[in-house]
Regions:
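Catalytic center-proximal scaffold of phosphoryl-transfer enzymes
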Residues: 1-393
């Protein structure tokens, strides 16, 4: 399949293959997981790669602070993906992609202009931010109070959002329905994973869909893949990752109550796609803290850089109006399902075994059941005779 796609002229790579019907709306969602490699291979990789690994998704520094800090986006994409051999000898990253067909309506206006109450519940927001990992300057959980049940019940939720009980929180208006998904997983870097993702998308006719979205977090390698292989798809930054940065910046250097009130204003702007208002408020707050990228100002500086870098992927009101997904919870759920198979305190893989199992797990989690097709075709190829190797005289 990959060879067939790569052999096509560029003009034909977005056409529908023969016998395939293009869906109405699709999304490609990309993320990364973790697994452990056997020590001898990990040490060999550490000797071969003497480059530092950022580990977390790249977060650019505000333009005004570039003189005092290294710009994250200046680093090469392949260096972004180098393994953390200097810090964690065993852990390595794998790439996961979900190609989903979706169903939703196109609306004349934003079907959900008001911020859902789930994002106004302090303990829920704290849990979301903790899971993403951006909590610099945020007070301990004990200083937050849960939203009363009668208030929480008015909100809405998405797949993967923190403890939002189904009985309490209804689905967000306009949220797309997932019809089917195809899963890909590999230990290969984005330079190899990107073409594979595009080839499978082509084979399913996704490039010919009327509405197409590419959803991911802020990792630079995700957007390198999007720009190179899915340039005509609408790029959407995962809302939860953006929320975590805004939450940390709002509370940095403030008392909990004051910071929470600021967060509610800022996250409302973000939800409504009013990114320039949010960016102006962040820059003002950063200046109040004296600028720079150290101390209390660090969380604000990081958020300013993050919003500056991804502001073209944050028009959430327009995305909801088009019925597109605004969160990467579908692929994050798949990453966890893959992790249930490959991660564990006593699970250490060789590179070949890890690659094979990642691909098998991805096929198992795909709705089109490629494993069933494989076994059926394999049975048809069997002759009942055992192949014999010729003996060398």
């Amino acid at each position: 399949m990959l060879d067939t796609w790569q052999g096509l002229p560029l003009a034909q790579r977005e056409e529908v293959p023969n016998g395939v019907e293009a869906p109405e709306m699709v999304a490609v969602l990309m993320d990364g997981g973790r697994l452990q490699i056997r020590l001898e291979q990990a040490e060999a990789a550490a000797d071969a790669d003497a480059q530092p690994e950022p580990g977390q998704p790249e977060v650019p520094v505000p333009a005004a602070a570039q003189a005092g800090a290294t710009q994250a986006t200046d680093q090469a994409d392949e260096a972004d993906e180098a393994d953390e051999a200097s810090r964690q000898r065993h852990w390595r990253e794998d790439k996961v992609g979900v190609l989903a067909t979706l169903h939703s309506q196109v609306h004349t206006t934003d079907p959900c202009p008001e911020l859902p109450e789930v994002f106004a519940d302090p303990l829920v927001v704290l849990k979301l931010a903790r899971e993403v990992g951006h909590l610099d300057g945020v007070p301990a959980a004990g200083t937050f109070r849960r939203t009363p049940p009668n208030e929480a019940a008015q909100g809405s939720t998405e797949d993967g959002e923190a403890d939002a009980a189904p009985a309490q929180r209804s689905k967000r208006p306009g949220r797309p329905e997932v019809l089917s998904k195809r899963v890909l997983a590999s230990r290969q870097e984005s330079g190899h994973f990107g073409p594979l993702l595009a080839a499978v998308a082509w084979s399913l006719g996704l490039f010919a869909a009327a509405r197409r979205a590419f959803v991911a977090d802020g990792a630079a390698c995700n957007w390198t893949v999007q720009k190179k292989y899915f340039p005509r798809w609408i790029p959407i930054l995962d809302f939860i990752h953006a929320l975590s940065y805004v939450f940390a910046a709002a509370l940095a250097g403030r008392a909990v109550q004051e910071g929470w009130e600021v967060y509610q204003q800022w996250i409302t702007w973000l939800w409504q796609g009013r990114v320039q208002e949010l960016l102006e408020a962040l820059r003002t707050r950063w200046a109040e803290l004296g600028g720079g990228s150290a101390g209390v100002a660090a969380a604000v500086a990081t958020c300013v850089g993050y919003v500056e870098e991804h502001q073209g992927r944050m028009n959430y009101a327009a995305y909801r109006q088009q019925g597109l997904p605004i969160m990467s919870s579908l692929v994050e759920s798949v990453v966890k399902q893959i992790g249930q198979r490959v991660k564990g305190t006593e699970k250490f893989w060789c590179d070949e075994g890890a690659e094979a199992l990642l691909q098998l797990r991805a096929d198992y989690l795909s709705d089109d059941e490629p494993l069933d097709t494989f076994w059926q075709e394999r049975a048809q190829r069997m002759t009942g005779q055992r192949p014999r190797n010729k003996r060398v005289a």
